[in-house]
Amino acid sequence: MYIINLLFRGHAVAIIYVTNQKHIADLKIYREKQKHRADMLVFVEDQKHRAKGDCLWFYTDQKHRADTIIYWEDQKHRADLKIYEVDQRHRAKGSF
């Protein structure tokens, strides 16, 4: 987890931009299919102002407005972080 803290440079994950260019991403993220294997349980907010902390995310189409740029990694062993998306806000947990 130390490397992830360095990549975030003190920013709480909240506003996320997804890129298809691995080399510009701050983090490579793998979507875990099983909740118990994930490093973090993430809830995706539908309103930007509600995305606070590490595990409450809001996706943006504007790269310059994002806190973090991520790349969806299809190989688990190449990912910096494994997440599982939960369907209820109170079930989100995890921090860097």
Regions found by a protein language model. Give the residues of each.
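Repetitive, compositionally biased segments used for assembly/scaffolding
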Residues: Y2-F96
